[in-house]
């Protein structure tokens, strides 16, 4: 039956092949949050393999014409994957629909069409290494691993919903990322998901199926072994008690000047709320991204009010817009920042967002695009300015946190920082732009994996959720649901040493890619000697 199905898929051509690739990519989205149906990958990727088999059937064409059919299949697969996985981005444009609704097709269709080029590239690279049986599965894993790595930095990068996350729906399956990194997880996921295509036979088919089963069992086994050695999920003797404030301010209200005092009072009220029975008195309180509705440098009364709300020894970490006056009366600069404020209402330290969202927080090619009448989605004169360096944020008792503002948490290779060693990751964000869509769940999963990957606990304060404290094994020690109003009180989990120490992320990536490339090329050469 599988051979018959594969044969029918291989024989598809024209729009039928494109539609099958699109639907296969869309089905693969079910492997990502909030669905986490990872078995969908065992359908989508074998179909992709068979579609590429059909696309490369001709061998009499020139080099480019041999590559293009596979690239087209990859593009349609990617287009389906990204349209169905990122459609919710368009909801941000409907917050101010009168001004931004015109851009909805660009967000819902244009961005997926661009991102699909990476999967077209993946299929094209795989085609170069394609060989019968196991060789094509290795080639596809290499192509996707390379493409997903490029997605982390090309054109400022947008590594959202990397295939590797499909293999990490629960903490048990997150532990391998500490060893092989996110690119390695993407390669593992593609190889294992695509392996059922070998059930139709081919060179080394049994070897490939056996290897996929072994890798899947090793992935699960390593997770079980790691978690069996993990400490208690909640450390009730932790050195630092943390409170996360989740106000769930509607996005339409957030930038309304008439609502500023009400928003501020709500944040202060949640900060002053007594801990529930059995919960610790917080040492550190965290507010979400741009939570403070004032420019603190020019609003001393807001700082005084914060100081009054904090108990002795408490520290507030809060997201706010930071203003830097222009030289000689020039235009001021604005930064998306995190402030540390002590119990006397003094600013102790600040950290600015380094990796801004294109078109959301700043305009690429600003002079040209402003000339066309375009502007950022965030209503900030001139947009935000990027911070120059990422540094550890001084907090309390000699401890410091690694600040990641909003979508900075999705970049696995951007966690280098200056200053003393951080004892936690602090991620402040505002996902209210996206409402009750898959977006906030996908964003949270990526931040959750950073804790495992880096060996640092995660403190995540999101305006409308998902707010949580996550230990270094990916386990949640306290959380609030989407759109809930309240606080999370919990002790800060301890950090742990990463599996490989802290080498630059690119070293791990290059080793994975070279291993896959060597295996693919070696299998091609061996097959030619043995079967021809």
From Swiss-Prot:
The gene is lnt. The chain crosses the membrane at residues 37-57, 75-95, 106-126, 128-148, 179-199, 207-227, 505-525. One of its GO terms (cellular component) is plasma membrane. Coiled coil: none annotated. It comes from the Bacteria. Catalyzes the phospholipid dependent N-acylation of the N-terminal cysteine of apolipoprotein, the last step in lipoprotein maturation. PANTHER family: APOLIPOPROTEIN N-ACYLTRANSFERASE. SUPFAM superfamilies: Carbon-nitrogen hydrolase. This is Apolipoprotein N-acyltransferase. Signal peptide: none annotated. Pathway: Protein modification; lipoprotein biosynthesis (N-acyl transfer). Pfam families: CN_hydrolase, LNT_N. Residues 245-494 form the CN hydrolase domain. Belongs to the CN hydrolase family. Apolipoprotein N-acyltransferase subfamily. The active site is at residues 289, 353, 406.
């Amino acid at each position: 039956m599988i051979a018959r199905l594969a044969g029918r898929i291989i024989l598809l051509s024209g729009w039928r092949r494109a539609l099958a690739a699109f639907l296969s990519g869309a089905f693969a989205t079910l492997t990502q949050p909030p669905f986490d149906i990872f078995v969908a990958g065992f359908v989508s990727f074998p179909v992709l393999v068979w579609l590429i088999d059909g696309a490369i059937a001709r061998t009499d064409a020139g080099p480019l014409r041999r590559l293009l059919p596979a690239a087209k299949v990859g593009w349609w697969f990617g287009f389906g994957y990204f349209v169905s996985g990122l459609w919710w981005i368009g909801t941000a444009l409907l917050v101010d629909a009168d001004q931004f609704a015109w851009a909805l097709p660009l967000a819902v269709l244009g961005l997926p069409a661009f991102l699909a080029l990476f999967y077209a590239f993946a299929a094209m690279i795989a085609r170069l290494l394609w060989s019968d049986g196991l060789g094509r599965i290795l080639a596809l894993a290499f192509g996707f691993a390379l493409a997903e790595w490029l997605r982390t930095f090309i054109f400022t990068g947008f590594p959202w919903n990397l295939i590797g996350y499909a293999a990490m729906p629960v903490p048990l399956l997150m532990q391998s990322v500490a060893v092989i990194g996110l690119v390695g997880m993407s390669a593992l996921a593609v190889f294992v998901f695509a392996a059922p295509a070998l059930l139709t036979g081919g060179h080394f088919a049994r070897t490939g199926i056996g290897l996929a089963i072994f890798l899947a069992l090793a992935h699960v086994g390593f997770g079980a072994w790691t978690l069996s050695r993990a400490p208690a999920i909640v450390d009730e003797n932790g050195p630092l008690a943390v409170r996360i404030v989740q106000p769930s301010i509607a996005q339409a209200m957030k930038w309304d000047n008439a609502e500023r005092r009400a928003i501020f009072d709500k944040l202060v009220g949640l900060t002053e709320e007594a801990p529930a029975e059995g919960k610790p008195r917080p040492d550190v309180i965290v507010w979400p991204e741009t939570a403070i509705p004032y420019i603190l440098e020019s609003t001393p009364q807001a700082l005084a009010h914060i100081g009054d709300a904090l108990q002795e020894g408490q520290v507030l970490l809060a997201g706010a817009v930071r203003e830097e006056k222009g030289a000689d009366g020039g235009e001021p600069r604005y930064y998306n920042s995190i402030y540390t404020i002590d119990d006397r209402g003094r600013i102790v330290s600040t950290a600015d967002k380094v990796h801004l969202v294109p078109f959301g927080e700043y305009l690429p090619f600003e002079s040209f695009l402003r000339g066309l009448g375009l502007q950022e989605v965030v209503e900030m004169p001139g947009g935000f300015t990027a911070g120059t360096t990422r540094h550890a944020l001084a907090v309390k008792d000699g401890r410091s946190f690694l600040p990641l503002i909003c979508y900075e948490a999705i970049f696995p290779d951007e966690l280098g920082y200056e200053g003393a060693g951080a004892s936690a990751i602090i991620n402040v964000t505002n996902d209210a732009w996206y409402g009750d869509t898959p977006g906030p769940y996908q964003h949270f999963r990526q931040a959750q994996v950073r804790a495992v990957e880096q060996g640092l606990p995660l403190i995540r304060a999101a305006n409308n959720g998902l707010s949580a404290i996550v230990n270094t094994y990916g386990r949640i020690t306290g959380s609030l649901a989407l759109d809930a109003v309240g606080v999370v009180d919990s002790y800060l989990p301890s950090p742990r040493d990463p599996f490989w120490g802290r080498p630059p992320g690119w070293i791990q990536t290059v080793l994975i890619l070279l291993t896959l490339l060597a295996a693919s090329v070696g299998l091609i050469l061996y097959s030619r000697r043995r079967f021809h």
